[in-house]
């Protein structure tokens, strides 16, 4: 069994939880006489420690710095695109290849059904997203979620297929960036991303984009032009990672915390700037603490947003989408 991943700022909480678990195990072991004052005292200690754990948990996760949110977004136990697809949707049929060079495993996509029987909603959609691995072997297979040009061309092929059959498009964004290798550049990485931006702006079907983890630069926006941009509470979205920003400005990665603050890359920051439309609330501690709850929350929001977008005609969708992205950004003079 893989060891539990504990981030540096989570260590005080982890240590308390470990102590609490040890006390619970000791209480159940039967080594404490059920009629003794010692057992009653131990129960009181456990209750007191439980309260301390809950209080510390809220204190930590309600006051995260921008860099700590970046760390949470990269947590290896966080749900990825395929996890969300299987938790939120039915009848997923993966489609492969860009019909030009190959099949990039860092981006997956296909038709699936998003439905809520209690709400009487059922809609076939095209779902596309970055996919990371869970261990060394699967990360190599998925190229650590860094897509090649053929990945973005595959994504565009699937979007055009969805447009042909008049199906909404949902993209799930989670990448440390587009793959920067020489081969990727030779095959037209920049052109593939630019083409996606151009074509996505004009898709005649509803498009919803969700940043579920990392949203780094062109690798993210290559599947990130939509009518509605949603973002998980502890995700990040920026033109550059804090480490890369730090290495450029300070010639060292040691200033990544300051870089994260300057980049204003969190969901709260981007909502205030008008870059995203809505924040998807995560379970306390991050999406990986309760993936099912996170998927249920996201599913409800997707259905709500789709219901509104499906009432709009193609011309309105395209006009509003272009106006939305054209209006982003500000110019400030010092």
From Swiss-Prot:
Q: Which InterPro entries does this one have? A: Acetyl_CoA_COase_a_su, ClpP/crotonase-like_dom_sf, COA_CT_C
Show the GO cellular component annotation of the record: acetyl-CoA carboxylase complex
Q: Which domain of life is it from?
A: Bacteria
The Gene Ontology terms for molecular function here are:
acetyl-CoA carboxylase activity; ATP binding; carboxyl- or carbamoyltransferase activity
Catalysed reaction equations from the record: N(6)-carboxybiotinyl-L-lysyl-[protein] + acetyl-CoA = N(6)-biotinyl-L-lysyl-[protein] + malonyl-CoA
GO BP, sorted A to Z: fatty acid biosynthetic process; malonyl-CoA biosynthetic process
Give the record's keywords alphabetically: ATP-binding, Cytoplasm, Fatty acid biosynthesis, Fatty acid metabolism, Lipid biosynthesis, Lipid metabolism, Nucleotide-binding, Transferase
Q: Quick one: which pathway?
A: Lipid metabolism; malonyl-CoA biosynthesis; malonyl-CoA from acetyl-CoA: step 1/1
Question: Does the keyword field hold Lipid biosynthesis?
Answer: yes
**What EC number(s) are associated with this protein in UniProt?**
2.1.3.15
SUPFAM superfamilies, per database record: ClpP/crotonase
* All residue ranges annotated as the CoA carboxyltransferase C-terminal domain in the record: 48-308
Coiled coil (UniProt feature): none
Pfam families to which the protein is assigned, alphabetical: ACCA
Q: Where in the cell is it found?
A: Cytoplasm
| Top class in the EC scheme | transferase
Family, per entry:
Belongs to the AccA family.
Role noted for this protein:
Component of the acetyl coenzyme A carboxylase (ACC) complex. First, biotin carboxylase catalyzes the carboxylation of biotin on its carrier protein (BCCP) and then the CO(2) group is transferred by the carboxyltransferase to acetyl-CoA to form malonyl-CoA.
- PANTHER family from the UniProt entry: ACETYL-COENZYME A CARBOXYLASE CARBOXYL TRANSFERASE SUBUNIT ALPHA (PTHR42853), ACETYL-COENZYME A CARBOXYLASE CARBOXYL TRANSFERASE SUBUNIT ALPHA, CHLOROPLASTIC (PTHR42853:SF3)
Assembly and oligomerization:
Acetyl-CoA carboxylase is a heterohexamer composed of biotin carboxyl carrier protein (AccB), biotin carboxylase (AccC) and two subunits each of ACCase subunit alpha (AccA) and ACCase subunit beta (AccD).
Q: What is this protein called?
A: Acetyl-coenzyme A carboxylase carboxyl transferase subunit alpha
Gene behind the chain: accA
């Amino acid at each position: 069994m893989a060891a539990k991943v504990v981030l540096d700022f989570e260590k005080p909480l982890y240590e308390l939880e470990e102590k609490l678990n040890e006390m619970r195990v000791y209480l159940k072991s039967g080594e404490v006489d059920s009629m003794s004052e010692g057992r009653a005292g131990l129960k009181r200690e456990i209750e007191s420690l439980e309260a301390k754990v809950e209080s510390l948990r809220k204190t930590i996760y309600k006051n995260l710095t921008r860099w700590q949110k970046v760390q949470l977004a990269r947590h290896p136990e966080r749900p990825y695109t395929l996890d969300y697809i299987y938790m939120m949707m039915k009848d997923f049929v993966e489609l492969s290849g860009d019909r030009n060079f190959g099949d990039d495993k860092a981006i997956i996509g296909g038709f699936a059904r998003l439905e809520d029987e209690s709400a009487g909603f059922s809609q076939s959609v095209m779902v596309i997203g970055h996919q990371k691995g869970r261990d060394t072997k699967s990360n190599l297979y998925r190229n650590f979620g860094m897509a090649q040009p053929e990945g973005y061309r595959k994504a565009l092929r699937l979007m055009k297929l969805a447009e042909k059959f008049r199906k909404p498009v949902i993209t799930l964004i989670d990448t440390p960036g587009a793959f920067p290798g020489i081969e990727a550049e030779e095959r037209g990485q920049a052109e593939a991303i630019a083409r996606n931006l151009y074509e996505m702006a004009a898709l005649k079907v509803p498009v919803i984009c969700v940043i579920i983890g990392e949203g780094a630069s062109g690798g993210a926006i290559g599947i990130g032009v939509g009518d509605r941009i949603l973002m998980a509470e502890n995700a990040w979205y920026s033109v550059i990672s804090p480490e890369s920003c730090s290495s450029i400005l300070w010639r060292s990665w040691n200033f990544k915390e300051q870089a994260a603050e300057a980049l204003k890359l969190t969901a709260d920051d981007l909502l205030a700037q008008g870059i995203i439309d809505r924040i998807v609330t995560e379970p306390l501690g991050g999406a990986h603490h309760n993936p099912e709850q996170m998927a249920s929350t996201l599913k409800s929001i997707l259905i709500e947003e789709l219901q509104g977008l499906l009432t709009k005609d193609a011309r309105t969708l395209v006009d509003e989408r272009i106006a939305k992205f054209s209006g982003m950004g500000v110019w400030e003079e010092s």
